[in-house]
Amino acid sequence: MNHQQQQQQQQKAGEQQLSEPEDMEMEAGDTDDPPRITQNPVINGNVALSDGHSNAEEDMEDDTSWRSEATFQFTVERFSRLSESVLSPPCFVRNLPWKIMVMPRFYPDRPHQKSVGFFLQCNAESDSTSWSCHAQAVLKIINYRDDDKSFSRRISHLFFHKENDWGFSNFMAWSEVTDPEKGFIDDDKVTFEVFVQADAPHGVAWDSKKHTGYVGLKNQGATCYMNSLLQTLFFTNQLRKAVYMMPTEGDDSSKSVPLALQRVFYELQHSDKPVGTKKLTKSFGWETLDSFMQHDVQELCRVLLDNVENKMKGTCVEGTIPKLFRGKMVSYIQCKEVDYRSDRREDYYDIQLSIKGKKNIFESFVDYVAVEQLDGDNKYDAGEHGLQEAEKGVKFLTLPPVLHLQLMRFMYDPQTDQNIKINDRFEFPEQLPLDEFLQKTDPKDPANYILHAVLVHSGDNHGGHYVVYLNPKGDGKWCKFDDDVVSRCTKEEAIEHNYGGHDDDLSVRHCTNAYMLVYIRESKLSEVLQAVTDHDIPQQLVERLQEEKRIEAQKRKERQEAHLYMQVQIVAEDQFCGHQGNDMYDEEKVRYTVFKVLKNSSLAEFVQSLSQTMGFPQDQIRLWPMQARSNGTKRPAMLDNEADGSKTMIELSDNENPWTIFLETVDPELAASGATLPKFDKDHDVMLFLKMYDPKTRSLNYCGHIYTPISCKIRDLLPVMCDRAGFIQDTSLILYEEVKPNLTERIQDYDVSLDKALDELMDGDIIVFQKDDPENDNSELPTAKEYFRDLYHRVDVIFCDKTIPNDPGFVVTLSNRMNYFQVAKTVAQRLNTDPMLLQFFKSQGYRDGPGNPLRHNYEGTLRDLLQFFKPRQPKKLYYQQLKMKITDFENRRSFKCIWLNSQFREEEITLYPDKHGCVRDLLEECKKAVELGDEASGRLRLLEIVSYKIIGVHQEDELLECLSPATSRTFRIEEIPLDQVNIDKENEMLITVAHFHKEVFGTFGIPFLLRIHQGEHFREVMKRIQSLLDIQEKEFEKFKFAIVMMGRHQYINEDEYEVNLKDFEPQPGNMSHPRPWLGLDHFNKAPKRSRYTYLEKAIKIHN
């Protein structure tokens, strides 16, 4: 709240010593209108400071400005004359300035009432907007007569630049403070006191290494508890030593989890700044950080240690993780009446403790080992002894040196059908004796444990913040690790403050509490926390990590200096050979020689460097920058080395980066003899490129380039073309100018000069020639013009099989002028099938996957199908191979359903009945696709199932158009049993049978139809059910049977009940309601998630 607002309540000094905060009174200062600091000499403040540290923390820091808490006072003289805001001098806590702010407060609606405004201000004069600091404080007005009667109120607030003060507008009534009888004012002086406890600030220059000796981990965002877990494992020093000793010399630096863990540990040990973890999570093989959001710290800890343990096998540190974290327990079941006991020994690496309804960790351990009575309906199956009353429990055989305790704060709530967080108070001690929970104790080595780490979560089940409090040396000196910020803290902050539950001072529900604890066995403390020095880190690992750092620093420097440089891409003439497209080369396939050049370096300097690198003297090379023309082509253009030699590279490139240059060189065979490039007169000469087209092979052949005068006639070039192509002289040639894609002009007149024969003659123009041979007419593409037209329409299309997930497909080169049948024919040849047995699908525009199917009579072209793809985007279509011709298939519909075979097993099938047909047609299609039983009726029926219950049987004449699929229901086809083909409607009935366990809405398994007879004993019905389900007698004895109607169930007395068909008929007047059904109440031994639900993926490290 803003301290300028008027308040509606007034606090009386004598009512309480420590008041509770009231929302309408606890306020933030007005940052838009900061209080004016009065300079009147009549009013002044005297500050009295006292160090709030306890004796145990005196050695935390010599520089008290970095302390975590302090008490300071501010005495306001001539208090009765106070008319404006006044601030105390600063008191530094966490190296931030804290001030007391006092002001009189008036109320427009109550002019005769006045109160004292009392606020705590933090870092108000900073210009930064990124800082924040969470603090708790007690604001107090001192009673000079009796300190016990001093009036105080408590605040808790996150201070930041917009809310840099917090407190109370009406801390006390003015009349109460100024009443001499109350003891708050003496000689017109009032003393204000603040005790403040602050967390380490964020967004300021906080040096964790300097103040604690440790550094934090950067927050990647969405990594939740990982930083807390990594710090916990890092300070398990014996584990850290073992991780360093893992051989990783040959590991891939981006995929090796041990190497990534070594890197994080090494940097935590040696860095002065927060350490990044992106390389570690990348080594897990995770593309996103979603895994952190879906799972808990126990799962990550378990899979991470499992991964490292597996990779320690066969090394000098094999067995380290079991040695540190593994304990043993025995699960037992002891029968009461017979001599039968079942024991199962198990290893464990952590213990999950229930905290709901438990006061402390001892009660949770008692609950963990509590004996469960197996009696009544829950008797134990003791084999040949049958069902017996028994006791079930666990006992700890051994406890590990490092004990991980998972506190079950996150639990599933069946009432709300979601996970909730339990914020109840739960106490845990600094020293934990556990001998009483061991089956056998060792007097020489009692199971006494010292608290080493407290992992804490603030927030609710949907999100929050994670920190860890660590006792690094096991000596009771605690630090708080809050991502990148590490700070000293008191033992109370680390332990008592994280019990959870109610805060006695603030009367608000604590959502900050411990969810995992790490204890170390006292006898193993020195071994587990043994010092880790540089001598414990293999030299080759140090060298590798330091080399990584050097390379990263070099790359960082390059990025910082990148704006000073540009790239020059050199393309040599050999890259033009074999090119079958427009222009001189394919930009996506060409291999450049790349130079990193200072933008301000001169052309002459670059040419000199280029000459040395390429191994040609400067008179044997010439530069031709590739210039984009207005018609979309890219051709070489003249660059005058002499005239432009002093110009800068960025100037000549016209800010193009990268800048591509064609490098012309002397023929390497002639270079050794000292040959130089011929002179080129830029005003009178032109450079042309020559290509020869061969209609027989439908291919282009690069024939080099020539210098020729602009006035030269076309006919004068014919001998050069014949020579370059290997034709005999005077061979009749047809010439074309390659103007741009899809525009190739024939040159008709050979007796005119180049500037008249070619359109807008320029350096880099291309002449394409071919033999004038009548046999060319037999070629599919007889002329260069038709070749380039075909090339313009040519497109590579990826065809993927729709039925194969993530199918990479195959590439076919097609013309975008092709129609549907031409495309189908080409693809069918590739697949060695009939074009009529293929169906094609468009690609979805918004995601990579098949879209709507194409009809076989589609009248558009391939260009129409691909028009929504971007120019450089891979073109993709989908197909599926059919078992019937597409003309027949298009008149059918796809119908997914479940087939229940004669072994009472379900399988998903897809049928293709006539889309205008009925259920009878669907059943006939099913007969073709499945195998029917040998001793069955040969007749099929279609059932509709919702929530594992049969809700109806569809008639054979019902139209398929009326059966629309939905995610909530399933269609099942099954063969009608012989005993259900003919039903005596007067005395018999088909009823629905479904499985459930305790709650009738929790159905599961395979429902079925059962024939019952009027008046038959229910034991006969049970025999048919047992035979159908093929269940052993002992298991079937556990089944209970109920008639379920309208969500309510009534259990059947199996020995007395005789079937009454009316019990399974709808109630009169409620014929629209579902029929009653027979429920089989038993435990669901099948996996809890069905094929109809999305499977939740387990957290997994892939590398």
UniProtKB/Swiss-Prot annotation:
<feature type="cross-link" description="Glycyl lysine isopeptide (Lys-Gly) (interchain with G-Cter in SUMO2)">
    <location>
        <position position="883"/>
    </location>
</feature>
<feature type="modified residue" description="Phosphoserine">
    <location>
        <position position="50"/>
    </location>
</feature>
<feature type="compositionally biased region" description="Acidic residues">
    <location>
        <begin position="20"/>
        <end position="32"/>
    </location>
</feature>
<dbReference type="GO" id="GO:0051090">
    <property type="term" value="P:regulation of DNA-binding transcription factor activity"/>
</dbReference>
<dbReference type="GO" id="GO:0005829">
    <property type="term" value="C:cytosol"/>
</dbReference>
<keyword id="KW-0090">Biological rhythms</keyword>
<comment type="subunit">
    <text>Monomer. Homodimer. Part of a complex with DAXX, MDM2, RASSF1 and USP7. Part of a complex with DAXX, MDM2 and USP7. Interacts with MDM2; the interaction is independent of p53/TP53. Interacts with DAXX; the interaction is direct and independent of MDM2 and p53/TP53. Component of a complex composed of KMT2E, OGT and USP7; the complex stabilizes KMT2E, preventing KMT2E ubiquitination and proteasomal-mediated degradation. Interacts (via MATH domain) with KMT2E. Interacts with OGT.</text>
</comment>
<feature type="modified residue" description="N6-acetyllysine">
    <location>
        <position position="1085"/>
    </location>
</feature>
<feature type="domain" description="USP">
    <location>
        <begin position="215"/>
        <end position="522"/>
    </location>
</feature>
<dbReference type="GO" id="GO:0044027">
    <property type="term" value="P:negative regulation of gene expression via chromosomal CpG island methylation"/>
</dbReference>
<keyword id="KW-0158">Chromosome</keyword>
<feature type="modified residue" description="Phosphoserine">
    <location>
        <position position="54"/>
    </location>
</feature>
<feature type="cross-link" description="Glycyl lysine isopeptide (Lys-Gly) (interchain with G-Cter in SUMO2); alternate">
    <location>
        <position position="870"/>
    </location>
</feature>
<dbReference type="InterPro" id="IPR002083">
    <property type="entry name" value="MATH/TRAF_dom"/>
</dbReference>
<feature type="region of interest" description="Disordered">
    <location>
        <begin position="1"/>
        <end position="40"/>
    </location>
</feature>
<keyword id="KW-0378">Hydrolase</keyword>
<dbReference type="GO" id="GO:0043065">
    <property type="term" value="P:positive regulation of apoptotic process"/>
</dbReference>
<feature type="region of interest" description="Interaction with p53/TP53 and MDM2">
    <location>
        <begin position="54"/>
        <end position="209"/>
    </location>
</feature>
<dbReference type="GO" id="GO:0004843">
    <property type="term" value="F:cysteine-type deubiquitinase activity"/>
</dbReference>
<dbReference type="Pfam" id="PF00443">
    <property type="entry name" value="UCH"/>
</dbReference>
<dbReference type="GO" id="GO:0002039">
    <property type="term" value="F:p53 binding"/>
</dbReference>
<dbReference type="GO" id="GO:0042802">
    <property type="term" value="F:identical protein binding"/>
</dbReference>
<dbReference type="Pfam" id="PF22486">
    <property type="entry name" value="MATH_2"/>
</dbReference>
<feature type="modified residue" description="Phosphoserine">
    <location>
        <position position="19"/>
    </location>
</feature>
<keyword id="KW-0227">DNA damage</keyword>
<keyword id="KW-1017">Isopeptide bond</keyword>
<dbReference type="InterPro" id="IPR018200">
    <property type="entry name" value="USP_CS"/>
</dbReference>
<dbReference type="GO" id="GO:0035520">
    <property type="term" value="P:monoubiquitinated protein deubiquitination"/>
</dbReference>
<dbReference type="GO" id="GO:0140673">
    <property type="term" value="P:transcription elongation-coupled chromatin remodeling"/>
</dbReference>
<dbReference type="InterPro" id="IPR050164">
    <property type="entry name" value="Peptidase_C19"/>
</dbReference>
<dbReference type="GO" id="GO:0005737">
    <property type="term" value="C:cytoplasm"/>
</dbReference>
<keyword id="KW-0539">Nucleus</keyword>
<feature type="compositionally biased region" description="Low complexity">
    <location>
        <begin position="1"/>
        <end position="11"/>
    </location>
</feature>
<dbReference type="GO" id="GO:0016605">
    <property type="term" value="C:PML body"/>
</dbReference>
<protein>
    <recommendedName>
        <fullName>Ubiquitin carboxyl-terminal hydrolase 7</fullName>
        <ecNumber>3.4.19.12</ecNumber>
    </recommendedName>
</protein>
<dbReference type="GO" id="GO:0006307">
    <property type="term" value="P:DNA alkylation repair"/>
</dbReference>
<dbReference type="GO" id="GO:0070203">
    <property type="term" value="P:regulation of establishment of protein localization to telomere"/>
</dbReference>
<keyword id="KW-0597">Phosphoprotein</keyword>
<dbReference type="InterPro" id="IPR024729">
    <property type="entry name" value="USP7_ICP0-binding_dom"/>
</dbReference>
<dbReference type="GO" id="GO:0005634">
    <property type="term" value="C:nucleus"/>
</dbReference>
<dbReference type="GO" id="GO:0048511">
    <property type="term" value="P:rhythmic process"/>
</dbReference>
<dbReference type="InterPro" id="IPR029346">
    <property type="entry name" value="USP_C"/>
</dbReference>
